[in-house]
Amino acid sequence: MLLIPAIDLKDGQCVRLKQGDMDQATIFSEDPAAMARKWVDLGARRLHLVDLNGAFAGKPKNLEAIEAILGEVGDEIPVQLGGGIRSLETIEKYLDAGLSYVIIGTAAVKDPGFLQDACSAFAGNIIVGLDAKDGKVATDGWSKLTGHEVIDLARKFEDYGVESIVYTDIGRDGMLQGINIEATVKLAQAVGIPVIASGGLSNIVDIEKLCEVEDEGIEGVICGRAIYSGDLDFAAAQKRADELNGELDDA
């Protein structure tokens, strides 16, 4: 089970939002590259970046910070990024800069042909981000709820060749209410590609619960506010996940 620290970028700083609200941003660091280094030193095996300004603007907005992070840790672990990815040119630019994966969210829902083209051009590098509330997909930085069922879209995107799915329960994100395990497992069971859980991770119990269902196809979990607020000790949590995986593998 991969525990993946999130570094959410707004105006070049590392922040956390509550339920995607740009007006409810808590600044945790003015040096995102140093924050990336901290998580890698604590044992992170992948990082999850979000260009928040880009998500709302529809184009890259935190390139300097992203390049600084890649310069700091990009040679050591895979780095994935979402937010504002709406063109093949942007994807190419990011992959050339050293990103391992790009996450396509809103654009995948609104323009499935773009996602298909991206999967064809950059096979193995494309993750789809599905944000949902009560089983329905949301777009545009969570500001618009669609009528699309998450599982229907996930199956379609799997056919396109996406590498994995980041599934966020937006009713829980930034609220420390616990991961929506049931919905995440339901999605993972419906597709044959890995699912990364996101939204609401609050403590070590969430990690233990996720490890129990990892075999359903859950590859990892994105760690946000909980590791910044201190509710979750990242290094201890990754160690615990590794221990549990070892026990489950031996069973």
From Swiss-Prot:
Subcellular location(s) of the protein: Cytoplasm
Pfam families, per database record: His_biosynth
GO terms (BP aspect): L-histidine biosynthetic process; L-tryptophan biosynthetic process
Main localization of the protein described in the UniProt heading: cytoplasm
Pathway linked to the protein: Amino-acid biosynthesis; L-histidine biosynthesis; L-histidine from 5-phospho-alpha-D-ribose 1-diphosphate: step 4/9
Organism superkingdom: Bacteria
GO CC, one annotated term: cytoplasm
Record-linked NCBIfam families: 1-(5-phosphoribosyl)-5-[(5-phosphoribosylamino)methylideneamino]imidazole-4-carboxamide isomerase, PRK13585.1
Protein name from the UniProt record: 1-(5-phosphoribosyl)-5-[(5-phosphoribosylamino)methylideneamino] imidazole-4-carboxamide isomerase
Species of the source: Burkholderia mallei (strain ATCC 23344)
Lineage: Bacteria, Pseudomonadati, Pseudomonadota, Betaproteobacteria, Burkholderiales
